[in-house]
């Protein structure tokens, strides 16, 4: 299979637009402007990027960033095999060569000295120097970089350099309005509308606890997990315990408060 076709999104991902984010992204892509998506965990940033890659008909290469990731993990390295030494492109280099959308998920998890390798690709130059190989890759006309992160987890140690931020246009994401979120949960998990609405209400109550013991409220993703368990015959209160309460806190008092909310709604 052609390398470009290998990374195409084959079927339409489900994405419920909550505003004009699709039109904004299309305008940015038309001008090959690098994009920064900011929002809480599980609010739909990654699904949005996947949907836009499908809609634009472009390959998508996703990199889950982490603190152990090095610049070589992005651009590539020399490898030894039985025939000798060969160069292996990293995901960023592959995306630049084939004209893919390169999505760096949770980019602030990577070290700052790693993320600076994207700088030449995010200005007028649109090049990627491969110093170890002595090559300069000129980005394919279709290439675009998209990064995402959760601003709620920012700290002095985990933030983007100003010189990096100012190379991107940005869009803020948040959890959808309750009626929209209920529709998403019902569609993705298969639960009925009434159950989806109750699950969303549990999540809303948890989000009110952000900064009061919880770093983050219950995400839309976790609501889909809970709904999926319910459709497989798990009792709603047990599904809430498994998918909504246990994953986000170990604090007994917070768990008690969330259980009480679930019991009120599903009694």
Curated annotation (Swiss-Prot):
<protein>
    <recommendedName>
        <fullName>Protein CbbQ</fullName>
    </recommendedName>
</protein>
<comment type="function">
    <text>May affect the post-translational activation and/or assembly of the oligomeric structure of RuBisCO.</text>
</comment>
<dbReference type="InterPro" id="IPR013615">
    <property type="entry name" value="CbbQ_C"/>
</dbReference>
<feature type="binding site">
    <location>
        <begin position="99"/>
        <end position="106"/>
    </location>
    <ligand>
        <name>ATP</name>
    </ligand>
</feature>
<keyword id="KW-0547">Nucleotide-binding</keyword>
<comment type="similarity">
    <text>Belongs to the CbbQ/NirQ/NorQ/GpvN family.</text>
</comment>
<keyword id="KW-0067">ATP-binding</keyword>
<feature type="binding site">
    <location>
        <begin position="39"/>
        <end position="46"/>
    </location>
    <ligand>
        <name>ATP</name>
    </ligand>
</feature>
<dbReference type="InterPro" id="IPR011704">
    <property type="entry name" value="ATPase_dyneun-rel_AAA"/>
</dbReference>
<dbReference type="InterPro" id="IPR027417">
    <property type="entry name" value="P-loop_NTPase"/>
</dbReference>
<dbReference type="GO" id="GO:0005524">
    <property type="term" value="F:ATP binding"/>
</dbReference>
<dbReference type="Pfam" id="PF08406">
    <property type="entry name" value="CbbQ_C"/>
</dbReference>
<dbReference type="Pfam" id="PF07728">
    <property type="entry name" value="AAA_5"/>
</dbReference>
<dbReference type="InterPro" id="IPR050764">
    <property type="entry name" value="CbbQ/NirQ/NorQ/GpvN"/>
</dbReference>
<dbReference type="GO" id="GO:0016887">
    <property type="term" value="F:ATP hydrolysis activity"/>
</dbReference>
């Amino acid at each position: 299979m052609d390398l470009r076709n290998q990374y195409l999104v084959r079927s339409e991902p489900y994405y419920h637009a909550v505003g004009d984010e699709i039109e904004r992204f299309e305008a940015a892509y038309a001008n090959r402007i690098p994009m920064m998506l900011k929002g809480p965990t599980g609010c739909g940033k990654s699904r949005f990027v996947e949907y836009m890659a499908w809609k634009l008909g472009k390959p998508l290469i996703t990199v889950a960033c982490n603190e152990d990731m090095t610049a070589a993990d992005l651009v590539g390295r020399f490898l030894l095999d039985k025939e000798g030494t060969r160069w292996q492109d990293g995901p960023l280099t592959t995306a630049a060569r084939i004209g893919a959308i390169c999505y760096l998920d949770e980019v602030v998890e990577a070290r700052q000295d790693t993320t600076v390798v994207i700088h030449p690709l995010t200005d007028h130059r649109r090049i990627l120097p491969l110093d170890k190989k002595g090559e300069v890759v000129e980005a394919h006309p279709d290439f675009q970089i998209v990064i995402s992160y959760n601003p709620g987890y920012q700290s002095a140690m985990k933030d983007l350099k100003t010189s990096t931020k100012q190379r991107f246009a940005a869009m803020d994401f948040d959890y959808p309005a309750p009626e929209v979120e209920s529709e998403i949960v019902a569609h993705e998990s298969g639960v009925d509308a009434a159950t989806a609405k109750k699950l969303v209400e549990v999540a809303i109550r948890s989000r009110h606890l952000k900064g009061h013991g919880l770093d983050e409220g219950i995400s839309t993703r976790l609501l889909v997990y809970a709904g999926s368990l319910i459709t497989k015959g798990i009792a709603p209160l047990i599904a809430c315990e498994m998918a909504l309460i246990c994953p986000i806190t170990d604090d007994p008092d917070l768990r008690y408060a969330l259980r009480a909310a679930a019991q009120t709604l599903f009694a």
